[in-house]
Design a protein with these regions (language model features):
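Conserved class I S-adenosyl-L-methionine
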Residues: 1-39, 52-56, 73-76, 132-161
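Class I SAM-dependent methyltransferase SAM/SAH-binding core
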Residues: 44-46, 50-93
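Conserved Class I S-adenosyl-L-methionine
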Residues: 50, 183-258
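A conserved beta-strand element that flanks and buttresses the S-adenosyl-L-methionine
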Residues: 105
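Short catalytic micro-motifs in class I SAM-dependent methyltransferases
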Residues: 108-109
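A short glycine-rich, Lys/Arg-flanked "PGG" loop and its adjoining helix->strand segment in the class I
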Residues: 117-129
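Short alpha-helix
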Residues: 162-177
Length: 258
């Protein structure tokens, strides 16, 4: 199944603005715990973006490798305080020798990889025996998943269903590739509630803050913003506040290479 492709070179300069410097991410703790569990000496992030998560793993090892399709993102990652070994390439044909890494992971990135099963097979190839694959992100197929901007921006939810593998499908891909001890873990609970006009300050609702919104034309994006503003005004006219709520779990699907 094909899905829209986002040119990250066009948004790389400001992409890290979505990560407030004072915010603590539980998914980062999960990554650190896993890296220590497998005693990771060499780590690869596929879809490494600006290097935000790789920089965190400097607490475990200095051998940090990142692969990204976007030259703009790689340029941004070179600004991280931690020296990173960065390569431009594709997730389905990893440019590394077999059995090179102790930990391979991606965060909020697998929906960009196209052939998810091919990525999982490549991950198995480049991991050392005893190494771990971790895929971290959300699952729009889940019944417990609620993201308020799905209700306001046309085509966004349908596009996500085309791009994301479900947790169960991803676990089956790992099994078919040869991974064992496959688990699905809830690693971070995202609960954000904006009241009234506060919603317009949500950093994740900026046009280029997420791939979901960045894929929209300016016209479609502004139409969604106007729908939000209309709900705010409608509530105000009734002496009420419109509530905009996102509530979901970030999941880590992980497996071990025997």
């Amino acid at each position: 199944m094909t899905s829209p492709h986002l040119n990250y070179d066009t948004i790389s300069d400001n992409y890290n603005q979505r990560y407030p410097s004072t915010f603590h991410w539980d998914r980062g703790d999960a990554l650190l715990d896993l890296a220590r569990q497998v005693d990771a000496k060499a780590v690869l992030e596929v879809g490494s973006g600006t290097g935000y998560w790789l920089n965190l793993l400097n607490q475990v090892t200095p051998q940090l490798y990142g692969l990204d399709f976007s030259a703009g993102m790689i340029a941004q990652a070179r600004n991280q305080p931690t020296p990173l070994k960065l390569t431009q390439g594709t997730a389905t044909r990893l440019p590394y020798q077999a059995e090179s890494f102790d930990l391979l992971y991606c965060v909020d990135a697998i929906h960009h990889f196209g052939d998810h099963a091919a990525f999982v097979r490549e991950a198995f190839r480049v991991l050392k025996p005893g190494g771990a694959l971790a895929v971290i992100g959300h699952d729009p197929y889940g019944n417990d998943f609620s993201l308020y901007f799905y209700d306001y921006f046309e085509t966004v939810y349908e596009t996500d269903l085309k791009r994301y593998p479900s947790s169960s499908a991803l676990k089956e891909m790992m099994k078919q590739a040869g991974f064992q001890n496959i688990e699905r873990l809830n690693v971070e609970h995202v609960l954000s509630i904006y009241k009234g006009e506060q919603v317009l300050s949500d950093p994740f609702i900026k046009h280029n803050a997420t791939s979901q919104l960045a894929l929209l034309s300016e016209e479609m994006y502004q139409a969604g913003i106007e729908r939000i503003k209309a709900d705010v005004r409608r509530a105000q006219s009734n002496n009420e506040q419109a509530i905009f709520k996102s509530d979901f779990w970030v999941r880590m699907i992980m497996g071990m290479k025997p």
